[in-house]
Regions:
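Soluble non-cytosolic domains of exported or imported proteins
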Residues: 12, 16-19, 33-41, 241, ...
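Short beta-strand element of the alpha/beta-hydrolase
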Residues: 143-147
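Extracytoplasmic/secreted proteins, especially bacterial periplasmic and envelope-associated proteins
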Residues: 17-20, 24, 41, 45, ...
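N-terminal hydrophobic or amphipathic helices/low-complexity stretches enriched
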Residues: 1-38, 47-58, 72-73, 134-135, ...
């Protein structure tokens, strides 16, 4: 059985390697917007690193079709429906009610469930994935993939300027305002007999002034149009090159130390366009359906490895709706305890979005997600502050050590069978 102790001892050097590589990509390559040239260039570069520096016999660059603008496009659909519903309130309230219901439907499908319901409305582009595998020397009994997404997020101007509390507060106000208007529209429709009319104080003063009261939410509705900036892409150093290089650093260290496993294949999945609604991971699962069913295959999916206080395993993902694999999740927690690093049992909460772990789990893979960020938004999340000079080497080193130990434990169990 392989001895991984030197890899764990050299975790600081591994973290420094990650920082240097991440800095190189951020400074010297195009911005990695989902479905754009920068994503492809970075994937091709990392695929080359995996082949030449990490010893992967297989390092495939793969493409897929997507509509990346659709993921945040629900904002335009939903908010426009709400504003139109507010106007309709004064003339045909039942139409306003229907518009707002449709707006919420768009939000739930695109963001709540990460479905592709409205993707067809947005331009098609080509995203990029990478699948790399280091073969074992003997019979294949198991396989471990380390995963990260190479694309970077579009800038969130409100979070960038005012911070996460203001960003989240605006969303809460908008949702509450839209719900208030929706039920007010239904009530107004019932009171007015579902007929077209011009609502005035003389017709029904209570219904009229409730409509006027809804105008207080209008500035917040318009603010939602600026909640993301599709013309500006951030560096994405933490989110999510930190995750891409977690697996790459492990494979490079194994090669440097001359470690070859007898029964465990070790691979890296770089799933593009995560910021566009897990589109790369979803495409990867479709393209590789059944390919890795031959032996136990685990996926450790990393995202935003930055803050050691929040380093944790997400037992639930996708707004808390999708269960991660308990065995894989527990294995990372066990490894953390063995190397003496604090790791939290956590989840991606409602309205917290999702990581690629959710897409793998939904496709039937044994997968878990590992993150190290505060789910109460920090000012570096999806902003220009997520830069190569804002990395946390200590957190990278600790997460790396846990991942190495988890791989060692998996290999020991598989090899003993």
């Amino acid at each position: 059985m392989a001895d991984f102790s030197k890899l764990i001892e050299n975790k600081a050097a591994a973290a420094r390697y990650m920082v240097d590589e991440i800095t190189h990509i951020c400074k010297d390559m195009p911005k990695r917007t989902p479905g754009e040239e920068g994503e492809r260039v970075a994937c091709e570069y990392m695929a080359d690193v995996l082949k030449n520096d990490c010893g992967c016999e297989r390092s495939d660059v793969e493409s897929f079709k997507e509509n990346p603008g659709s993921f945040f496009g629900w904002i335009y659909i939903t908010i426009t429906c709400v504003l139109a519903g507010l106007v309709s309130y004064f003339f045909l309230p039942i139409l306003g009610f229907a518009l707002i219901v449709f707006g919420f439907f768009a939000m739930i499908m695109q963001f709540g469930l990460y479905r592709k319901t409205f993707d067809f409305l947005f331009p098609e582009k080509t995203g990029t994935n990478v699948t790399a595998i280091k073969k074992c020397t003997g019979e294949v009994k198991g396989r471990v993939f380390f995963n990260g997404h190479p694309d970077a997020a579009w800038n969130w101007p409100v979070n960038n300027r005012f911070g996460g509390k203001v960003y989240e507060a605006n969303i809460v106000v908008v949702v509450l305002g839209a719900l208030f208007l929706m039920f007010a529209s239904l009530a107004a429709a019932i009171v007015t007999g579902f007929k077209p009319m011009i609502l005035t104080p003389e017709l029904n003063s209570v219904i009229f002034w409730i409509g006027i009261a809804n105008l207080v939410f209008v500035p917040f509705y318009f603010g939602m149009y600026r909640m993301w900036d599709p013309k500006t892409t951030v560096d994405g150093a933490n989110d999510n090159l930190s995750a891409c290089y977690m697996g790459i650093a492990i494979l490079k260290a194994m090669k440097d130390q001359g470690i070859e496993l007898e029964h465990t294949e070790v691979g890296v999945i770089l799933s593009g366009s995560e910021e566009a609604g897990l589109r790369g991971a979803k495409a990867w699962c479709e393209q590789h359906k059944g390919e890795f069913d031959d032996v136990p295959t685990w996926i450790y999916s990393f995202d935003t490895i930055h803050d050691p206080k929040f380093l944790g395993v997400n037992y639930r993902d996708l707004n808390g709706l999708v269960k991660a694999d308990k065995e894989v999740s527990d294995s990372f927690m066990e490894a953390a305890e063995q190397v003496g690093v604090k790791c939290n049992k956590t989840l991606v909460p409602p309205f917290g979005g999702a990581t690629d772990s959710a897409a793998f789990a939904q496709a039937g893979f044994k997968a878990t997600g590992v993150t190290a960020l505060n789910h109460v938004l920090e000012d570096y999340y999806h902003t220009l502050k997520d830069s190569y000079d804002n990395l946390n080497e200590a957190c990278l080193a600790d997460c790396y050590a846990i991942a190495v130990k988890a791989l060692e434990n998996f290999d020991n169990r598989i090899s003993s069978k």
